[in-house]
From Swiss-Prot:
It comes from the Eukaryota. A motif (PAM2-like 1) lies at residues 467-475. PANTHER family: ATAXIN 2-RELATED, ATAXIN-2 HOMOLOG. One of its GO terms (cellular component) is cytoplasm. This is Polyadenylate-binding protein-interacting protein 3. One of its GO terms (molecular function) is RNA binding. InterPro entries: ATXN2-like, LsmAD_domain, PAM2_motif, Sm, SM_dom_ATX. Residues 486-498 have a biased composition (Polar residues). It comes from Arabidopsis thaliana (Mouse-ear cress). Keywords: Repeat.
Length: 587
């Protein structure tokens, strides 16, 4: 092996290595007409010689490994070869992979930039991996080097003539291997001898492990509530496992038995790319009704707790606990319906009471009932109408012990008293209240057909406090408040709507000033309604008035020393004096 040594640069700037390389390559090229080298043209025409030349040509520019007789291995780019009697080659960017002693070289990561010449007497073999030998492969590699070309599927299938992938087969365990269904405790089996990596490292290598489980997991605080937390965690886990799923893989992991109606392979079944989003619901062994029952049980377990206690699988204490929870839940549901009916009736009562104005309440000194009693009577009437409207809902809502309805004569008497009171006050009302009075009377007459509760029950319902705020106080109207009635004379009459005034401001002409060459033009007076007016309280010199456009910029008027400033005058409108303030207690 004689490597080519680096030589200094020549005087013309080119290195001697280039000329030596070109001279050696010229001597290495065979010539058919040259017979001085000891071989003739017939030796090149042999099939083995042609095949060797073809393989050598295919290796040019590819990464190869060259094995020598002394055991050394070089790796580099195949650059040139001498196909004459001896088969010497030249490697470019060659590096030593393995020396003659069989040890790997440390200079593998630092490839040499030299041209390495290997004579034929030291060469054993040349190994080239992934070398294209067919013309199709060469054309494919050349076409794939074009990054700007758009490659379609059909074009790619024509380029790469590769073998088809082998068909996947399902894994079948050997018969002598035991079945380990539980992989969590696989090392606890007796045939595994309880293998522990920390003990093995300590026994074999003397290494003491510093592994702390609390650094990677959540530390469980043992206490009186630990058992309840574990039961709750197991219940949530059972709910998750018992949920319905549309994924075949998840269903199999949860232990759901699937029938053999799936005509798909194992790859499609467990692949994440070609996942099956839907499958037939009849794949389960249970029918559709049992599946719905399981789904309802999951919802009930999530809301009221585990339902396994009702089946007798849990201890007696647990069953009693769930039985109490079911009873409490039913009680809460009944109370919720009662509160809902009470809130709806109370809402209806407030809505109808808000329609009646404050004039329905009597004035102080009247022998009719006060305002609070009247409000309670109205509330009891509407509550009775809402409670006794649907008798079928009484047993569900918990009103089995409600008192019987009051006689119609008693109802008609009370509502007649209210209607008479409303009519008497409507006669003394002011003119603008006739429409609202008619609507209120119609509402009162329509409410006269509704039954009410007894006075005792209505009083108990009206005296209840809100369940939202225990410290809330009951709101009652002030019975000593005086009703406010505005007098017709104090009200301001509504004047007809005046048309929108679009006029301009008119000013009297400015008197002539001595020495002023600029004169203001005057025009005729603008007819129509003229207010507001701006004028000077001085003697006008001309009947004409100067016109100022409202959209034009206004400039100050030139004034004489003795001239007074213009005054803006607004004509007063006839109005009556306002109502005097009588104080806070008068309302």
């Amino acid at each position: 092996m004689k490597p080519v040594l680096h030589s200094g640069s020549s005087s013309n700037g080119f290195s001697h290595r280039r000329f030596e390389k070109e001279a050696w390559m010229n001597n290495a090229q065979p010539s058919v007409d040259n017979t001085e080298n000891g071989w003739d043209a017939e030796s090149v025409d042999t099939p083995s010689q042609k095949l060797l030349v073809y393989f050598t040509t295919c290796n040019i520019g590819h990464q190869v490994e060259v094995h020598l007789k002394n055991g050394s291995v070089y790796s580099g780019i195949f650059h040139a070869a001498n196909v004459e009697k001896d088969f010497g080659i030249i490697l470019k960017m060659a590096c030593l992979i393995r020396d003659s002693r069989g040890t790997k070289s440390r200079t593998v990561s630092k490839p040499s930039s030299k041209l390495l010449k290997i004579p034929a007497d030291e060469l054993v073999q040349v190994i080239a991996k992934d070398l294209p030998l067919s013309s199709d492969s060469v054309s494919d590699s050349v076409q794939c080097e074009k990054p700007l070309e758009l490659l379609t599927d059909s074009l790619i299938s024509q380029f790469y003539n590769v073998d088809l992938e082998r068909e996947l087969k399902p894994w079948v365990p050997d018969e002598d291997v035991p079945d380990c269904s539980d992989l969590e405790n696989v090392f606890d089996d007796p045939w595994k001898r309880g293998w522990n990596q920390f003990e093995v490292n300590k026994t074999l290598f003397g290494v003491t492990s510093t592994f702390d489980e609390e650094l990677y997991t959540t530390k469980l605080e043992r206490g009186p509530g630990t058992r309840e937390l574990e039961e709750q965690a197991l219940r949530i886990a059972r709910e998750i496992v018992g949920e319905n799923t549309r994924d075949i893989h998840v269903a199999e992991e949860r232990g759901l038995q699937l029938s053999g109606k799936f005509d798909i392979d194992e790859e499609t079944k467990y692949s994440s790319v070609c996942a099956t989003n839907r499958f037939d619901d009849t794949c389960y062994e249970d029918d559709e009704e049992e599946e719905e029952d399981i789904l309802l049980d999951c919802c009930n377990n999530l809301t009221f707790g585990d339902s396994s206690a009702s089946d007798g699988k849990e201890p007696a204490s647990t069953g009693k606990f769930y039985e109490d929870s079911w009873g409490d839940s039913l009680h809460l549901r009944s109370n919720k319906m009662v509160d809902q009916s009470w809130s709806n009736s109370n809402k209806h009562t407030r809505q109808l009471m808000s329609e009646l104005p404050s004039k329905d309440f009597p004035v102080a000194g009247n022998n009719i009932r006060n305002e609070s009693q009247l409000g309670e009577q109205r509330k009891s009437k509407f509550l009775g109408a809402s409670l006794f409207k649907k008798p079928s809902e009484e047993s569900v809502s918990g009103f089995e012990d409600a008192p019987p309805p009051v006689k119609p004569s008693f109802i008609d008497g009370r509502l007649g008293l209210l209607s008479d009171r409303a009519k008497s006050e409507n006669s003394s009302g002011w003119p603008g209240s006739s429409i609202s009075r008619n609507s209120e009377n119609s509402a009162a007459s329509s409410a006269s057909n509704l039954p009410i509760l007894s006075p005792s029950s209505s009083g108990s319902l009206s005296s209840e406090k809100s369940t939202l705020n225990p410290n809330a106080k009951e709101f009652k109207l002030n019975p000593n408040a005086k009703s406010f009635k505005p007098s017709p004379s104090a009200t301001r009459p509504q004047s007809p709507q005046s048309p929108v005034f679009d006029g301009s401001f008119y000013y009297p002409p400015v008197p002539p000033m001595p020495g002023l060459h600029i004169r203001y033009g005057t025009g005729a007076a603008f007819p129509g309604q003229q207010h507001p007016m701006m004028y000077n309280n001085t003697t006008q010199l001309s009947p004409n008035q100067t016109y100022y456009s409202p959209n034009s910029p206004q400039y100050p008027q030139p004034m004489m020393v003795t001239q007074q400033r213009p005054i803006l005058f607004m004509p007063p409108t006839p109005y009556q004096p306002e109502m005097p303030y009588k104080g806070r207690d008068s309302y």
